[in-house]
């Protein structure tokens, strides 16, 4: 249960993955292996990849069940852009936002080698003026102008255009990411949140 959001049911399919998806995941696994083999997991200790098959099946379910208004996808904190690539393979116009320059570079190199076209923005997913503070139970979002603030804009992206946001937050950031989604997304947008150990859920703002 996430305050202010309504859960969207998921019915993940089973069976074989499409060849293009398997190829993408194999290439992504190689990048991830090299990354940790270089000892960079200690440098970027907050980067932990989600289970890509679980993510793929969840996005696929939202498409099959017609839960989405359109096919525009944004991965917040995209790391290697694995989810953005999966979304593109499912027919989305996809992008990712990542603050760490090295992760952006690796995601773009992976994308280009595999012939995909999703965009990777080397930016913060916090709009200008928004801040994160440590609250009693985790991180909280500070919104300029308070709850009645207008929907934010990025210089590089209009979040109101996004139909599906994806994020894998740390446990103490789940409520913060839900707060951010309530400001970024419009009433038709869906937030897909990976919650670790194969758990994933989808949410939409209450009407």
PLM-predicted stretches and their roles:
Residues 1-69, 108-159:
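S-adenosyl-L-methionine
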Residues 69-79:
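Conserved class I S-adenosyl-L-methionine
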Residues 164, 171-207:
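C-terminal substrate-binding/active-site "lid" region of AdoMet-derived donor-dependent transferases
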Residues 104-105:
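Short alpha-helix immediately C-terminal to the canonical SAM-binding loop
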Residues 80-92:
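Conserved SAM-binding loop of SAM-dependent methyltransferases across substrates and taxa
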